[in-house]
Each structure stands twice: as structure tokens, then as C-alpha cells.
């Protein structure tokens, strides 16, 4: 199974013309993130056959030079967003990795699908592209991963992500959940939750190679 087939199946099942038309207008008349060519970067960097872990985000960062198509990740020269800083703090506490760069492309290439449930946003307006159709698309992506893959780790931080559990066959996949790494909630159960070592322990238990969460130039 490949993304091209899954995309075909989804667009055959659902009509996204209204969303397409909306996005054409938005990109023509407003500043929208990420750039058009990066909307689907999560799928470009993580082929379907390579998926070992799915980390769900919400919508892209809405500031300049941040979003580039991967949930929680920002472009190499951007400042660290607070949630990502907390993710790295937990990573250091969990498995001793100290990451210096704010982008997660190496995770994506390792097999971590960094999926936002909404893939675009207008500059400076969080959630501005909610309910235009992206949730239908990404719900189908989650279901496809659940249906066609086995032994995938789904990391679900915060209530919106955890609402997607209903789309996942928990009998053949691993669910790791906690509060969101946002500064508003990180001290209420994200710190100390050890998602990275737990994910690798599960992958190794089912005969898969672990994720290299540490800094990589690959």
C-alpha cells in the first residue's frame, strides 16, 4: 500500500472540491502556512510502508518561517516553540537525547508520521482552517494506517488527539497518551510520561527496530 493509493481512495470516497476552492482563494488573497509545496510534507518524508509511529498534532504553527508540513516541527532557523521545547526536555529526561535543531525531518525519515489533523492555517489566526474538510481527510489517513498496518505506535497528546482513538484498532496497535506538551499542561502529566522510551520498547517487543529520537543529520 502506498500513499498515492490511499489518497485516491479518500478522494473517491469524499468530495473535497469546496475545500480545494477555499484553499485556492486563501492562498491567493491571504498569507497561509505552510507554503503550498509543503502541505503534504509529512507524507513525502514518511512513506506509508515506513510508518512505525504516528504523532498527532492539531493545526500548523501560524507565524512566519515556522510551519513546513510536519506536526510540532518548525523550519531550521526558527525559534523553538514552547511545546517543542517541552518535548525536547522530556526527551532528554527520558532517554538522554539533547536536540539542538527545531525541525523534526529526521524523525519523519525514521518512520514517525508527524500528522496535524488540519494541514493549513491563515497567518496569525490559529484554527482558521478548522472545519473546511481537513479533519475528514486526516481521519481517513488515521483509519488507513490503523487498517493496513500492524504494530504502529500512536502518540496522542491532549484531548483533541485522544478523541481519535475511536479510529484506531487498539487490538493491534499501541496507544501512548498524556496531556499536551504545551506549557499550560506539561506539568500535569506530560513531563515524566516517557513516550519515547515507551514507543521504542513496544517496537522492539514486536520485532521492529527502534526510532532514533536523537539528533541526526540524515
From Swiss-Prot:
Location(s), subcellular: Cytoplasm
Listed EC numbers: 3.2.2.27
Main subcellular location: cytoplasm
Active-site residue list: 59 (proton acceptor)
Catalysed reactions, as listed in the record: Hydrolyzes single-stranded DNA or mismatched double-stranded DNA and polynucleotides, releasing free uracil
Pfam families hit by this protein: UDG (PF03167)
Coiled-coil intervals, chain numbering: none
Keywords, ordered alphabetically: Cytoplasm, DNA damage, DNA repair, Hydrolase
Any one biological process term the GO annotation gives: base-excision repair, AP site formation via deaminated base removal
A molecular function (GO) term: uracil DNA N-glycosylase activity
Keyword set includes Ion transport: no
Gene3D superfamilies per UniProt: Uracil-DNA glycosylase-like domain
UniProt cross-references to CDD domains, sorted A to Z: UDG-F1-like
SUPFAM superfamilies reported in the protein's UniProt record: Uracil-DNA glycosylase-like
GO cellular component, one term: cytoplasm
Entry keyword annotation includes Hydrolase: yes
UniProt record similarity statement: Belongs to the uracil-DNA glycosylase (UDG) superfamily. UNG family.
Function: Excises uracil residues from the DNA which can arise as a result of misincorporation of dUMP residues by DNA polymerase or due to deamination of cytosine.
HAMAP family on file: UDG
Protein name per UniProt: Uracil-DNA glycosylase
Gene (UniProt): ung
